[in-house]
Amino acid sequence: PQMNFFDATLSKKGDKYVATVQGKDFELPADKQEALKKMDKVPVDIIAGVRPVHIHLSQDGIDAMVDVSELMGSELHLHVNSNGKDVVIVVPTTDIDLDAVHGSHKPVKYSFKPELMHFFDKETEKNLF
């Protein structure tokens, strides 16, 4: 399946590991916290991957502007520009106000759950976990 890829950084803030994606920090889940403790190689630049269906609209999320929206039955496919990056978001139509986001040139905010993110080494492109 399609995936959105973001330049990101893994770092430690306090006693927790976070992935910083598009300027927003995402605290990693416990299994990845443990794996990173063993690796002991942060901060490090990475690539974060998120599938379009794992992205949700969120009032406190990352800013984006809708370029194109496609109503596909029970889903709305949003093609957005976020800080110069093209991102595809697929959201159930039952979860959103269609008038607020359907169409072009509409501002939206999006986010994702860290447990649904994939992390890749920036140089080798191999999965980190």
Which ranges hold each PLM region?
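Non-catalytic connector elements of ABC transporters
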Residues: 3-5, 9-129
